[in-house]
């Protein structure tokens, strides 16, 4: 795997951050719906 990160954000970093953000939003949504606040979303 060549080092092609010349002034750009690496693709794996974007994927990791995007995946963590999506998981975080899903966790918050499911937790809110479990508690009873998710219905307002």
Curated annotation (Swiss-Prot):
Q: What is its main location?
A: plastid
Its protein name is: Photosystem II reaction center protein J
Per the UniProt record, which residue ranges are transmembrane?
9-29
In what way does this protein cross or attach to the membrane?
Single-pass membrane protein
The family database entries (SUPFAM superfamilies) matched by this protein are listed as: Photosystem II reaction center protein J, PsbJ (SSF161021)
Q: Which family does it belong to?
A: Belongs to the PsbJ family.
The compartments listed are:
Plastid, Chloroplast thylakoid membrane
Q: Name one Pfam family in it.
A: PsbJ
Q: Which NCBIfam families did the record assign?
A: PRK02565.1 (NF002722)
């Amino acid at each position: 795997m060549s080092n092609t990160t010349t002034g750009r954000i690496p693709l794996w970093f974007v994927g990791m951050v995007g995946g963590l953000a999506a998981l975080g939003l899903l966790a918050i949504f499911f937790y809110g719906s479990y508690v009873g606040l998710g219905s307002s979303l």
